[in-house]
Amino acid sequence: MKNKALFLDRDGVINVEKNYVHKIEDFEFMDGIFETLRYFQEKGYLLIIITNQAGIGRGYYTEEQFHILNDWMLSEFEKEGIYITKVYYCPYHPEHGIGKYKRDSFDRKPNPGMILKSQKEFNIDLSKSILVGDKESDIQAGKRAGVNVNIIFSNNKNGDELDCCKKINSLSELVSLIL
């Protein structure tokens, strides 16, 4: 039997968007994230994070710093009884990357690479899955991969001008939208 997944962008969906968050002291969970993820976990969704991390490519922080923050974030979720299936990240940037990080990548949203990797790794039925992002590139990745429901979290100006998909203004709206 195939799994269904809730795909989540990180910055701007799981945590408050700040410029290139890479330190624990700068990481602030979005209001309602724990309750929302707990609900979807209880409904049998795999919880998968897909995040572009151009700050690595630009040299603002290292992959090691990303992993330290990521491990802390996952432990905070676990304290709340929430288990993230996997975090996929893309450190590359085609224009502003430095050294080995300056390249295009099929994993970099709006490309669907991270979603398609997870589909294969966890036997995911994308037609029964949901993606939540806060930028058009998130939604494009979901659509290109064949994710059935793509939702823009328009808690900021990025989502307000888009006519691409369903919109929510708070994470609590996600639960009622899917019911």
UniProtKB/Swiss-Prot annotation:
It catalyses: D-glycero-alpha-D-manno-heptose 1,7-bisphosphate + H2O = D-glycero-alpha-D-manno-heptose 1-phosphate + phosphate. The record marks 108 as: Contributes to substrate recognition. The active site is at 9 (nucleophile), 11 (proton donor). It is an enzyme of class 3 (hydrolase). Pathway: Nucleotide-sugar biosynthesis; GDP-D-glycero-alpha-D-manno-heptose biosynthesis; GDP-D-glycero-alpha-D-manno-heptose from D-glycero-alpha-D-manno-heptose 7-phosphate: step 2/3; Cell surface structure biogenesis; S-layer biogenesis. Gene3D superfamilies: HAD superfamily/HAD-like. Pfam families: HAD_2. One of its GO terms (molecular function) is D-glycero-beta-D-manno-heptose 1,7-bisphosphate 7-phosphatase activity. Mg(2+) binds at residues 9, 11, 134-135. It is found in: Cytoplasm. Substrate binds at residues 9-11, 17-20, 51-54, 108-109, 135. It comes from the Bacteria. The keyword Lyase does not apply. Its cofactor is Mg(2+); Zn(2+). Its EC number is 3.1.3.83. Monomer. Belongs to the GmhB family. This is D-glycero-alpha-D-manno-heptose-1,7-bisphosphate 7-phosphatase. It comes from Aneurinibacillus thermoaerophilus.
